[in-house]
């Protein structure tokens, strides 16, 4: 029997797969998935003609009351921003590009999924 942690991990992976497909359909090139630096992580880093996108993916089952994007609170935004700065410092090629902080909120109902794309979900104070 699958435990809760395994279920959440599989749901998250499915959500990230859908988000990548969605982004590629919009013309993005996926640069990184689950990029890590120390204790920080960015779910997806993609690029389009406008710039570089740091994407937080939130996936939930339909029966959960709050929408997935509500989990991207100020503390989470700060961690994503710190991770983005680390990425930009380690990637001189992307350092001078316009940066966007987006959220892919994915709601699953059985095998069906609804992707809500939230471009520029937040604007950090320092980037």
Where are these regions (language model features)?
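Conserved catalytic cores of phosphodiester-cleaving nucleases, focusing on short active-site segments
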Residues: 23, 42-65, 80
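Domain-level recognition of nuclease-like catalytic cores that cleave nucleotide substrates
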Residues: 90-127
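Hydrophobic residues on conserved beta-strands that form the core of alpha/beta folds
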Residues: 30-32, 54, 101
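Mg2+/Mn2+-dependent nuclease catalytic core
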Residues: 61-84, 90
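Anionic group-transfer/hydrolysis microenvironments
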Residues: 34, 43-45, 58-60, 104-107, ...
């Amino acid at each position: 029997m699958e435990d809760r942690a395994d279920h959440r991990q599989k749901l998250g992976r499915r959500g990230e797969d859908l988000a990548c497909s969605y982004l590629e359909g919009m013309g993005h090139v996926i640069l990184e998935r689950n990029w890590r630096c120390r204790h920080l992580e960015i779910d997806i880093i993609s690029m389009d003609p406008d710039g570089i996108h740091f994407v937080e993916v939130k996936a939930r089952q339909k029966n959960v009351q709050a929408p997935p994007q509500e989990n991207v609170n100020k503390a989470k935004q700060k961690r994503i921003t710190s991770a983005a700065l680390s990425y930009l410092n380690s990637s001189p090629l992307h350092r001078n590009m316009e940066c966007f902080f987006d959220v892919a909120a994915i709601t699953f109902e059985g095998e069906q999924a609804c992707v809500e794309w939230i471009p520029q979900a937040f604007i950090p104070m320092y980037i």
